Amino acid sequence: MDTLIAQLQRRFCDFTISLYHQGFLDDQFTELKKLQDECSPDFVAEVVTLFFEDCEKLISNMARALDQTGNVDFKLVGSSVHQLKGSSSSVGAKRVKGLCVTLKECCDSQNYEGCVRCLQQVDIEYKTLKAKLQDLFNLEQQIVQAGGRIPQVDI
């Protein structure tokens, strides 16, 4: 059993490090993890779940606004992307945040094609991050279920 726990912990560490090195996460995610303790062991998963729910709504709102060909409300899109950028920043979603900056620039210049293209990229990155973090949380659960402790990962 100790071997299994050690293997899971190693996978967890390697996977976590890869998320940072590939630019999916930044230091804000590390800060968020520091707020999690034994009294609230699911804190990060809960915050991230709320973030992803927020992402879905905001992306959907922006897609609807951009679907109004010839009558796009760039102010609405800009407001939504500003919210998404803030949420992304608060959970350490580095790639999503970076794409939001580009999308906001497209909104500010009323570049319709740029907005559509960037929104598609935001949607892809959000879905990719969601899948990767779900894998990370699943690894955490496996470690705990096997009787182990979640290792501290130094980035």
Swiss-Prot record:
Transmembrane regions: none
Residue span, HPt domain: 40-147
Domain of life of the organism encoding this protein: Eukaryota
GO cellular component, one term: nucleus
Gene3D superfamilies per record: HPT domain
N-acetylmethionine modifications at: M1
Induction profile: By salt, cold and drought stress.
Tissue/organ expression: Strongly expressed in roots. Detected also in flowers, leaves, siliques and stems.
Entry keywords, A to Z: Acetylation, Cytokinin signaling pathway, Cytoplasm, Nucleus, Phosphoprotein, Stress response, Two-component regulatory system
GO molecular function: histidine phosphotransfer kinase activity; protein histidine kinase binding
PTM text: Two-component system major event consists of a His-to-Asp phosphorelay between a sensor histidine kinase (HK) and a response regulator (RR). In plants, the His-to-Asp phosphorelay involves an additional intermediate named Histidine-containing phosphotransfer protein (HPt). This multistep phosphorelay consists of a His-Asp-His-Asp sequential transfer of a phosphate group between first a His and an Asp of the HK protein, followed by the transfer to a conserved His of the HPt protein and finally the transfer to an Asp in the receiver domain of the RR protein.
Phosphoprotein recorded as keyword: yes
Main location: cytoplasm
GO biological process: antipodal cell differentiation; cytokinin-activated signaling pathway; embryo sac egg cell differentiation; phosphorelay signal transduction system
Subcellular location: Cytoplasm, Cytosol; Nucleus
Modified residues (Phosphohistidine): H82
Subunit details: Interacts with the B-type response regulators ARR1, ARR2 and ARR9. Binds to ETR1, AHK2, AHK3, AHK4, AHK5 and CKI1.
Function as written in the Swiss-Prot or TrEMBL entry: Functions as a two-component phosphorelay mediators between cytokinin sensor histidine kinases and response regulator (B-type ARRs). Plays an important role in propagating cytokinin signal transduction through the multistep His-to-Asp phosphorelay.
Swiss-Prot/TrEMBL domain comment: Histidine-containing phosphotransfer domain (HPt) contains an active histidine that mediates the phosphotransfer.
Protein name: Histidine-containing phosphotransfer protein 3
Originating organism: Arabidopsis thaliana
